[in-house]
């Protein structure tokens, strides 16, 4: 769709329209396609990357800009950038059925890709293929939420799939290097957060190599910094502890 605005002679292309009704009137903003979801999920923070123009319209396709008095009446301000933010956050994205279907299909595939990348069969430590995760998502009738980020939805999918199949987040492999004095005491606090201790070395310092659930990383990092007052170190050896080859459904 190509739009010509007579007010500022800017030709708008590749437009996604976001609409809001307020005070009995319709207001629209012109955004770049595929950017609205990024803004709403917090991935995109630069407003200029989302908005084609900071103007508020009553009809984007006709280039009809909203009147100042209508903006003040509906929003209590004529600050168009602030109004654009409101519409962008709470308005309704206008897309065709075909576009919506394509977007949902792509999000479904993206969610499956994230799940396949982050998870394994806990018994074999092998990853599942994206195709198998997609099939499993269809089996549980997972419905994509267009206003939620794919990462958030991937976490939801993992929880739901756990009830139907053998799947869990792949473990991270870490190395801690801790001062000996605080090391033994700190190890006891770290124990509940470690899944598997692969090696321990007591020499001048305490060195531990272990596997953890990725969700515990921040807590472990903060605990080591706090208890050692910055003298301990934490190194990520691998983001995923997996075996070679893909897992197959039996």
Curated annotation (Swiss-Prot):
Q: Which residues carry this modification: N-acetylserine?
A: 2
Q: Does the keyword Transport apply?
A: no
Q: Tell me a GO biological process for this protein.
A: bone marrow development
State which tissues express it. Answer: Detected in adult liver, brain, heart, spleen, pancreas, kidney, lung and testis (at protein level). Detected in heart, brain, lung, liver, kidney and testis.
Q: Any idea which UniProt keywords this protein has?
A: Acetylation, Cytoplasm, Cytoskeleton, Nucleus, Phosphoprotein, Ribosome biogenesis
Phosphoserine found at: 238
**InterPro entries on file:** Ribosome_mat_SBDS_CS, Ribosome_mat_SBDS_N_sf, Sdo1/SBDS, Sdo1/SBDS-like, SDO1/SBDS_C, SDO1/SBDS_central, Sdo1/SBDS_central_sf, SDO1/SBDS_N
Cellular compartments per GO CC: cytosol; nucleolus; nucleoplasm; spindle pole
Summarize the record's disruption phenotype note. Answer: Embryonic lethality. Embryos cease to develop prior to 6.5 dpc. Reduced assembly of 60S ribosomes and accumulation of halfmer ribosomes.
Task: Report the subcellular localization.
Answer: Cytoplasm; Nucleus, Nucleolus; Nucleus, Nucleoplasm; Cytoplasm, Cytoskeleton, Spindle
Molecular function terms from GO: microtubule binding; ribosome binding; rRNA binding
* UniProt KW Acetylation keyword: yes
Chief localization? cytoplasm
One Pfam family per UniProt: SBDS_domain_II
Assembly state and interactors? Associates with the 60S ribosomal subunit. Interacts with NPM1, RPA1 and PRKDC. May interact with NIP7. Found in a complex consisting of the 60S ribosomal subunit, SBDS and EFL1. Interacts with CLN3.
* Family membership: Belongs to the SDO1/SBDS family.
* NCBIfam families to which the protein is assigned, alphabetical: RNA_SBDS
**Protein name per the record:** Ribosome maturation protein SBDS
Organism of this sequence: Mus musculus
Q: Could you read off the lineage of the organism from its UniProt record? A: Eukaryota, Metazoa, Chordata, Craniata, Vertebrata
């Amino acid at each position: 769709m190509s739009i010509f605005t007579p007010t500022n002679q800017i030709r708008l292309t590749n437009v996604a329209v976001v609409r809001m009704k307020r005070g009995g009137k319709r207001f629209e903003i012109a955004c770049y396609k595929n950017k609205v979801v990024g803004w709403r999920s917090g991935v995109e923070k630069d407003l200029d990357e989302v908005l084609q123009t900071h103007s508020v319209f009553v009809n984007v396709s006709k280039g009809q800009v909203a009147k100042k008095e209508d903006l003040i009446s509906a929003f209590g301000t004529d600050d168009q950038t602030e109004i654009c933010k409101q519409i962008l956050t709470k308005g309704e994205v206008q897309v065709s059925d075909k576009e919506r279907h394509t977007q949902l299909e792509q999000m479904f595939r993206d969610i499956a890709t994230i799940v396949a990348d982050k998870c394994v069969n806990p018994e074999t430590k092998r990853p599942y293929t994206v195709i198998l995760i997609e099939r499993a998502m269809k089996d549980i009738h997972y419905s994509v939420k267009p206003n939620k980020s794919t990462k958030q939805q991937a976490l939801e999918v993992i929880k739901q799939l756990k009830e139907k199949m053998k799947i869990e987040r792949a473990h991270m492999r870490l190395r801690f290097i801790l001062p000996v004095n605080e090391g033994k005491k700190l190890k006891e606090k770290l124990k509940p957060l470690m899944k598997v201790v692969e090696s321990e070395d007591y020499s001048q310092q305490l060195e531990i190599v272990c596997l953890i659930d990725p969700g515990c990383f921040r807590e472990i990092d903060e605990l080591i910094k706090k208890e050692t007052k910055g003298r301990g170190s934490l190194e990520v050896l691998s983001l995923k502890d997996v075996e070679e080859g893909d897992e197959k459904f039996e």
